[in-house]
Amino acid sequence: MYGIEYTTILTILISIILLNYILKTITNTMDYIIFRFLLLIALISPFVRTQNYGMYLPITGSLDAVYTNSTSGESFLTSTLCLYYPAEAKNEISDDEWENTLSQLFLTKGWPTGSVYFKDYNDITTFSMNPQLYCDYNVVLMRYDNTSELDVSELADLILNEWLCNPMDISLYYYQQNSESNKWISMGTDCTVKVCPLNTQTLGIGCKITDVDTFEIVASSEKLVITDVVNGVNHKINISISTCTIRNCNKLGPRENVAIIQVGGPNALDITADPTTVPQVQRIMRVNWKKWWQVFYTVVDYINQIIQVMSKRSRSLDTAAFYYRI
C-alpha cells in the first residue's frame, strides 16, 4: 500500500517537473520569435513609407516664398487627386484639351494619367457648404477678392475643417457657446443674424428679449455667417427664417486631405479665430499670377510639395462640409 502511495507521489513530482520544463521551453521559444520579429521591424522601418494620421504639419508660408520646384516627388500610383477651380478659369483658357494637357504635365510629377480629376464650381460659397471632396487629396483653388476677404476666410474655415452640426430651434430655446470650437453657422440666400445676450435672470444685457430691434446685429444680408459670441452666456437669437437656417456646430478638427491655394492677394488668408495667438496658415498657400494657365502651371510644379503637408484621405469618404445630427 505504501509502495503505491510513493509511486503516485513520484509520478506527480515527475509530471510537475516535466510540465515546468515544457513551459520553460515554450517561453524561451516565444521570446526568441518575438525578439526576431521586433528586430526585423526595427531593421525595415526606415525603408517603409507609411501614412501617419496623427501628425499634422501646417504650412507656414506661401508657395512663392517657401517651397522649391521639384520634379522628383513620390510616385502616387495608387492615389487620386482632385483639383477644384472656379468656372471662370475654364472660360478664360477656352481650350477643349486643357485638362488633357494638365494631365500630361502631372504625369511628369509622378501622377499617372487618370489619377488627377478636374472639377469646376460656379460659386465658392455654395461649394463650401457641401464641397463633396471624394479624392485621396483635394486641392481647392480660390480666387482672392479684397472686397470679401472676411467672407472667404470663413469659407476656408468650412473647407479645411470638419464640423458636427445640430439644428437650432431659436423660437423656443436660448443658446450658448461653450468653447472656441463651438460656433453658430447660418446659411441661406439672405442671412441677417441678431443676438441678445442674457444674464442669469434671463434678462437682456443691453437689449430687450421682447424687442428684436434692440438686438445686436452680427451679420446683415449674407449667404454664410459663422457667429462667435461670448462663451458661457445664454443668447436669444433672431434670424430671417424664411431665407436662412442656423445650426449649432462644433469643429471636429482639420480635414487633413484638403488644401486651399489662394489665387492673388497680398497675403495668404488667416482663418485663426483666436486673436491672442500668432496667426497660423493651415494648408493655405498663395500663388500670385493673373492668368489661369500660369496658376495651373504653378500648381503642377509644386503639387508634390503640397501633398507632403497633407494626409491621405480624411475621416470619411464623403467629406461634405457638415455632419448633421437630428
From Swiss-Prot:
Disulfide bonds: 82-135, 165-249, 191-244, 196-207
Protein name: Outer capsid glycoprotein VP7
Organism: Rotavirus A (strain RVA/Human/Japan/S2/1980/G2P1B[4])
Annotated glycan sites: 69, 146, 238
Pfam families: VP7 (PF00434)
Region (CNP motif): 165-167
Keyword annotations: Calcium, Capsid protein, Disulfide bond, Glycoprotein, Host endoplasmic reticulum, Host-virus interaction, Metal-binding, Outer capsid protein, Signal, T=13 icosahedral capsid protein, Virion
Residues engaged in binding Ca(2+) 1: 95, 206, 214, 216
Leftover remarks: Some rotavirus strains are neuraminidase-sensitive and require sialic acid to attach to the cell surface. Some rotavirus strains are integrin-dependent. Some rotavirus strains depend on ganglioside for their entry into the host cell. Hsp70 also seems to be involved in the entry of some strains. In group A rotaviruses, VP7 defines the G serotype.
Highest taxon of source: Viruses
Similarity field: Belongs to the rotavirus VP7 family.
